[in-house]
Amino acid sequence: MIKNIAIVSLSRGVAGEAFAQHEVEIGLKRLAGYGVNVQFMPNALRGIDYLTTHPEARAADLLQAFRDPGIDMILCAIGGDDTYRLLPYLFDHDELRRAVTGKVFLGFSDTTVNHMMLHKVGLPTFYGQAFLPDVCELGPAMLPYTERYFTELLRTGTIREVTPSDVWYESRTDFSPSQIGIAPAAHPDDGFQLLQGSPTFSGEILGGCIDTFYDFFDGTRYADMPQLCRKYDLFPTAEDWKGKILLLETSEERIPPEKYRAALTHLKNAGVFRAVNGVLIGKPMDRKCEDVYKQLLVEVIDDPALPVVCNLNIGHAAPRCILPFGVRACVDVVAQKITFA
């Protein structure tokens, strides 16, 4: 059972801004209800400007959290877009590998980069939720489906099975205090959807936000990101992808179809689709471009035998499950479940 949680801001420093304090307070009250001890790492609440200017401070927080034997779980506050800037401070002198201990690490979105860092040093992690977007949900409570998996992770330190949500929620556009207690609009959901290939397959899941993976290869957003990712061999090799299950989900930026195609093409050229046993696709926010994305997946992958399963409740569309990386997963679309060894 998780007893001590450290919250880190490895990307954008939203948690330290005044405009987010009502959300932080909500989240802390909910965590208190679990009976866990919560600490913000020293730089986690220093705000957007400071953390943007000081990636070394973000890296220091992560290293300190791993080195502290009293911390059971590292919970990311939120994503962002520049956590790649931590790479030199975590790998130049093998700092991360020497610091890592067996703790639960949970985050998503830009935290995809941190998951790849931790995969590189051999730590299994958990993808799918974060403090501000999930624990600090402005409604009367955490979204029930989201809460179910968060609770399981806190109580057991793992996730044993994932099934689809009965509903999906419209994304919020207003995070002001006026929205406290107001639940997001809900719609019936359709379960896991088999786009192509066998309905059953297995392997260790690895992946994350496709927008972030695009930036691994393309320097339009940050010119030095592809350079640093290559320097530190951050993107897994084709051999590393062999036998795994690729997870892809889209961000709140609602990636345009032409960029989605380009991102898939980068992954294809890296040998990912030839190596993996299957692909899992998270539901897009508000289901925007859903059908176009499916068409592009079929076209770019160009292998009808490779299983592709869509409409998972993972990533930027609410509610969110949690998927373990680094443990064997068995996907069964007919039974509508993913089980973990």
Residue ranges and their predicted role:
Residues 73-75, 106, 245-249, 280:
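Structural motif
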Residues 7, 74, 110, 213, ...:
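Buried hydrophobic positions in well-ordered alpha/beta secondary-structure cores of metabolic enzymes
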Residues 259, 265-268, 278-341:
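ATP/nucleoside-binding phosphotransfer catalytic cores, i.e., glycine-rich phosphate-binding loops
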